[in-house]
Design a protein with these regions (language model features):
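Extended, folded cores of ATP/NTP-driven motor/assembly subunits in large transport
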Residues: 2-412
Length: 412
């Protein structure tokens, strides 16, 4: 390992090519390359860990418990990865999955009264679904960065580091009252999650088969590990060789796994069709997708506890993504100090009757507030980005939902 790799992390090696795709295909459009030990590998060689959370009802907590939960989450942010993403997925209630869960409870239950309650629930829940019952799923994801310092730059080592970070997040979130789901097979969980996210229509009537990872072979039904290893080794050696001289004998290049007939991760999650030509929305698997972004001045200056609840409870077809990006402390404090000093010097030349007098005063007050929080209270500075996804089965319904969401954002 050279000095550059030791300091900056170097490049990742040993990534298997389970994502081969032809140019212009739907598979090539997808950003996902592989799934390793419950970690998503993207085409630009980023590694992302995804956790599903079971939320707590914030409004049923006492004032003391609310404050404690906020403080515990703030404590987690101090040691959390620099890039966090919180997703709130709104989708129709999964009746089949819930009834399957109740049947499992019913088989294990020995108390007759409890069995009667479970049977009543199994009869009543389908009636709720007829009234368009919705469910929310919450996810926390973070990506690998060189500061995490994996022992070596292999996908397995990076996945191990991210799984350790996930255990830390699980402990801190448990103190907040938020449980983290632990799937039995993490790779299958991630694969099924993306399949449902991308194929919103198809996934309702066509599920991935059990043991779907066994399909990732040269030819489905044929599992020759030695052939796979030899193919990967030959492809890696071919990519690493220097340019041949003009008089060298040209050897036949080895087949890629795609050309050899391999089934890949993108093959399993790719939608039947994608249309990106409309200026207002994407059409994926027959579902229209539109996206709204809240600008920097779109947030209220002062907010209370649970201030994002109206957006989360916006209704059917509306999902949210919150991106939190931690900024370096020293660099941020210096930038805030310089900006505040410049604003103070400008304040001397601005009369109190000018329109920007109050704006400069507010900017100076905000700068002093941020500096005090970071210097005296040890707080960190984060940039927050909010992306709203709106989906519908047809363009007219999509336009109505987008308009309603824009109105809700203005009112909030």
């Amino acid at each position: 390992m050279n000095l550059k790799n030791a300091i900056f992390g170097g490049s990742v090696t040993g990534i298997s090519d389970r994502s081969g795709a032809y140019d212009g295909s739907i598979q090539a459009w997808l950003p996902i390359k592989d799934i390793v030990q419950g970690v998503v590998v993207t085409r630009d060689k980023r590694f992302v860990k995804i956790l599903e959370l079971l939320p707590v009802n914030f409004y049923t907590m006492s004032s003391m418990d609310k404050s404690a939960a906020i403080e515990d989450f703030a404590a987690y942010l101090k040691i959390a990865p620099a890039n966090l993403q919180i997703n709130v997925l709104t989708q129709p209630f999964d009746l089949d999955g819930y009834l399957k869960l109740l049947r499992g409870y019913l088989e294990r239950e020995t108390n007759e009264q409890c069995r009667l309650m479970l049977e009543e629930s199994m009869d009543y829940v389908p009636q709720l679904v007829e009234r368009e019952a919705l469910t929310h799923r919450f996810f926390l994801s973070f990506s690998y960065d060189p500061s995490m310092k994996a022992p070596d730059h292999t996908p397995e080592a990076i996945a191990a580091v991210l799984n350790e970070k996930a255990e830390v997040a699980r402990r801190y979130l448990d103190r907040c009252g938020v449980a983290v789901l632990e799937p039995e097979y993490a790779d299958n969980f991630i694969l099924e999650l993306f399949y449902k996210l991308i194929n919103k229509h198809t996934s309702q009537h066509l599920r991935l088969p059990d043991g779907v990872f066994d399909m990732l072979g040269m030819v489905h039904g044929v599992y020759d590990e030695e052939a796979l290893k030899a193919l990967d080794t030959a492809a890696a050696e071919s990519a690493g060789k220097k340019k041949r001289k003009w008089f060298s004998r040209k050897e036949a290049s080895p087949l890629s796994r795609l050309e050899a007939g391999a089934t890949t991760i993108p093959d399993l999650i790719a939608p039947p069709d994608i249309d990106t030509h409309h200026p207002d929305y994407l059409l994926i698997d027959g579902v229209c997708h539109a996206y709204l972004y809240i600008s920097g001045y779109g947030y209220s200056t002062v907010v209370g506890k649970g201030w994002l609840t109206p957006l989360i409870e916006a209704g059917e077809g509306v999902s949210l993504s919150f991106y939190l990006v931690k900024q370096p402390r020293e660099k941020t404090v210096n930038a805030i100090g310089q900006t505040t000093m410049i604003n103070r010097s400008r304040m001397r030349d601005v009369g109190d009757t000018r329109q920007d007098f109050e704006e400069l005063g507010d900017a100076i007050g905000a700068g002093l507030y941020l500096k005090e929080g970071m210097n005296r209270e040890g707080q960190d500075f984060y940039y927050m980005h909010t992306l709203i996804e709106v989906i519908a089965d047809d363009p007219d319904t999509l336009e109505q939902r987008v308009t309603a969401e824009e109105t809700l954002c203005v009112a909030s």
